[in-house]
């Protein structure tokens, strides 16, 4: 093999090595690009996932706030409705209280009412001796009906006529005005056992309060259909 052949063979080997090196370099480049694209895609997907999670979190927060605000508005509306209902019911009660002031105006009917209240109180107490308290302006009415009230009680309870002492301490007078906040009494009596352990309040105001509480569910049902 002469020098020319040797030189050609060397050049051929160099070309082969260069080609192999270029192919390897190309493979490395392609592989690196593929890995880069994969990592880039993974980063993009991770960022997308992060953005979706953040959006979902904020959307949930907005939904929760919206539900809270709706609940607060609904509760506020309910409170307003309940307050309006209470105002109407209280206005009815106040109107009834004003009507009570007219009861004692008819002396004849009021005396009969006082007698019924006294008999009812005696039947409730069932005591041989009781203390009766009334308004100062009603004292003469009480004295006029007291004897017949004691007799009626004795007949109904089948007992002797009880001793009834009219107290010198009086119930508060009728209110001086409709919007008065002072202690007042529209009429009726308060009776108690002599030792004061048993007390029966049978004033017009107390009877109205009892009747109103008893009828309140029915009143609300008729007014508000609930």
UniProtKB/Swiss-Prot annotation:
Gene3D superfamilies: 6.10.250.1620, ATP synthase, E subunit, C-terminal (3.30.2320.30). Keywords: Hydrogen ion transport, Ion transport, Transport. GO terms for molecular function: proton-transporting ATPase activity, rotational mechanism. The keyword Lipid metabolism does not apply. The keyword Transferase does not apply. GO terms for cellular component: proton-transporting two-sector ATPase complex, catalytic domain. V-ATPase is a heteromultimeric enzyme composed of a peripheral catalytic V1 complex (components A to H) attached to an integral membrane V0 proton pore complex (components: a, c, c', c'' and d). Belongs to the V-ATPase E subunit family. HAMAP family: ATP_synth_E_arch (MF_00311). Subunit of the peripheral V1 complex of vacuolar ATPase essential for assembly or catalytic function. V-ATPase is responsible for acidifying a variety of intracellular compartments in eukaryotic cells. This is V-type proton ATPase subunit E. The gene is VATE.
